[in-house]
């Protein structure tokens, strides 16, 4: 394997253990779309749906890929959400998720953060997800 492939810089990104794409750090829509395109199997379709819901809900959302995960935020207010692929699900992290109503279902080691996991056969409640995104975008974000 060439060095650029190991580093995720070739035409086909490397999948890290658990299936998360290795995408170089970058700001804007392009690196996030590269991440979504590199999500394995069914996860790419869900990633596109999540990204579209986020864009519709927060029209001027700022995007970046950091630590091999897409981040979504508000300029000058920090990041409110990130995505990460695992073997059997996509983890959506709401950095101020404990303040959302209803609270996203999965707890975190961080008191403020809550997660929402989406598996291959799960039904995505788009209205609930959009409601969480809207609420999260109005809270102070994380400066990561």
Name each model-derived stretch.
Residues 2-144:
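Charge-dense, helix-prone N-terminal extensions
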